[in-house]
Amino acid sequence: MARSLKKNPFVGNHLLKKINKLNTKGEKEIIVTWSRASTIIPTMIGHTIAVHNGKDHLPVYITDRMVGHKLGEFAPTRNFRGHVKNDNRSRR
């Protein structure tokens, strides 16, 4: 279910403060966050945000096409290695 248009998009306060501080300074540095539920807003464009996937922080470079999506969409949490081939000949 989509978020109501009456509400603003969710962005963690700590993340928003860091983005605004870097924008006023004009600096670019990696911002580490655990907030996968935060929505990407236009002020984040051009920044690199390291999003936690449960094990590591994966760096995500924010582009204009990502606006409106969540940060967690770009840091996959599961690693699928493929199905094991069932080789009956090797057991004999």
Swiss-Prot record:
GO terms for cellular component: chloroplast; small ribosomal subunit. It is found in: Plastid, Chloroplast. GO terms for molecular function: rRNA binding; structural constituent of ribosome. The keyword Metal-binding does not apply. Gene3D superfamilies: 30s Ribosomal Protein S19, Chain A. Keywords: Chloroplast, Plastid, Ribonucleoprotein, Ribosomal protein, RNA-binding, rRNA-binding. Pfam families: Ribosomal_S19 (PF00203). Disulfide bonds: none annotated. InterPro entries: Ribosomal_uS19, Ribosomal_uS19_bac-type, Ribosomal_uS19_CS, Ribosomal_uS19_SF. One of its GO terms (biological process) is translation. PANTHER family: RIBOSOMAL PROTEIN S19P FAMILY MEMBER, SMALL RIBOSOMAL SUBUNIT PROTEIN US19M. Belongs to the universal ribosomal protein uS19 family. Protein S19 forms a complex with S13 that binds strongly to the 16S ribosomal RNA. This is Small ribosomal subunit protein uS19c. It comes from Cucumis sativus (Cucumber). The gene is rps19.
